[in-house]
Amino acid sequence: MGFITKAIPIVLAALSTVNGARILEAGPHAETIPNKYIVVMKKDVSEEAFSAHTTWLSQTLNSRLMRRAGSSKPMAGMQDKYSLGNVFRAYSGEFDEAMIKDISGHDDVDFIEPDFVVRTTTNGTNLTHQDNVPSWGLARVGSKQAGGTTYYYDPSAGKGVRAYIIDTGIDTDHKDFGGRAKWGKNFADDMDQDCNGHGTHVAGTVGGTQYGLAKSVSLIAVKVLDCEGSGSNSGVIKGMEWAMRDASGGGNGTAKAAGKTVMNMSLGGPRSEATNQAAKAISDAGIFLAVAAGNENMDAQHSSPASEPSVCTVAASTKDDGKASFSNYGSAVDVYAPGKDITSLKPGGSTDTLSGTSMASPHVCGLGAYLIGLGKQGGPGLCDTIKEMANDAIQSPGEDTTSKLIYNGSGK
């Protein structure tokens, strides 16, 4: 396992609008969920106008169902609503072509995007230290040179910072978390556990006692993918919304709480305006968000949320400071981090070694938590701090791609 991919076959090609909302076509290598869509409102739409729109939607759907009762299988209609700050309001659900055309003609709607499947794919002065590290990535982040076996770090180790892992869940009972991991919310299935393993591995790199960069951080599981590592894009966005609200105390006192929060999304796929806007809403709330660049060995501008400029997009490096062969690249990449043959935690108390930009992103998320614990300013600007601290180390990073490899500033 590694990066999480999304795929969307074209199903909207036959639909078009004149003087209406954009109906976005899907990419060429994709797997849509039949008749399911995400409807995104214009940025200036108020909460009151959004409520009025969804009321209109319900009334219109009910009227149509009454007119065609017994003639065909009814559509489920709206299933989820999203409100991330004041910049992203949307809903998702099951609608037929006629209803989509009606929705697209509504003045408050910005665009409509097909919902699709998401799945995993493989491919200082007061320093302390950890000798004979279990994962080479730790030693590399704590050292200026490759080849070390010791992780140098400040003992504050991300204490007082919360890390939200938007993934397949976390084995919160794994002994390496030392009781610092807790369950947040499940948007994938009815099993509040990581029955896939991807999320536990990611969380271990962020904040495991032996395997993590920020060894004192608090970890929160946000499950958006099921036991098969599969879920919907609408479910992922719902998890993003919940994490943002929870990080800000349910919407109260956002600034202070958000500044002490980091999030990781080791997932992505074809470029999605809905995903990018939701990610930007998290950044606009003052939260640091690390995301995987993708594993297709292509320009990350074609992936989401990797292509969103406000997040910290992470490509994968190898043990000898090369670009991992699978890693995406390009101007969207902010930094490189270790991502090939990374050992971390596995549900049930054991460990596993995986490769992918999924493994690189949590190194940056963990470093973000570590730096906030040291007193650095949190939020999206933290990515600039990480880039400034990074070393020019990556050989042949790819066309129009940074050669910066993350470093925690230990002085070693």
Swiss-Prot record:
Induction of the gene: Expression is highly up-regulated during infection.
Gene name per UniProt: SUB6
InterPro entries listed in its UniProt record: PCSK9_ProteinaseK-like, Peptidase_S8/S53_dom, Peptidase_S8/S53_dom_sf, Peptidase_S8_Asp-AS, Peptidase_S8_His-AS, Peptidase_S8_Ser-AS, Peptidase_S8_subtilisin-like, Peptidase_S8_subtilisin-rel
Glycosylation sites: 252, 264, 408
Enzyme Commission code(s) on record: 3.4.21.-
CDD domains: Peptidases_S8_PCSK9_ProteinaseK_like
Main EC class the enzyme belongs to: hydrolase
Catalytic residues in the record: 167 (charge relay system), 198 (charge relay system), 358 (charge relay system)
Occurrences of domain Peptidase S8 (ranges): 135-412
UniProt function note: Secreted subtilisin-like serine protease with keratinolytic activity that contributes to pathogenicity.
Gene Ontology annotations for the cellular component aspect, listed alphabetically: extracellular region
GO biological process terms held by the UniProt record: proteolysis
Propeptide span(s): 21-127
Organism in which the protein naturally occurs: Arthroderma benhamiae (strain ATCC MYA-4681 / CBS 112371)
Keyword Plastid: no
Main location: secreted
Compartment annotation: Secreted
Residue ranges of every copy of the Inhibitor I9 domain listed in the record: 36-120
Recorded GO MF terms: serine-type endopeptidase activity
Leader sequence residues: 1-20
Family (UniProt): Belongs to the peptidase S8 family.
PANTHER family named among the record's database cross-references: CEREVISIN-RELATED, PEPTIDASE S8
Name of the featured protein: Subtilisin-like protease 6
Pfam families named among the record's database cross-references: Inhibitor_I9, Peptidase_S8
Keywords (A to Z) from UniProt: Glycoprotein, Hydrolase, Protease, Secreted, Serine protease, Signal, Virulence, Zymogen
Keyword Ribosomal protein: no
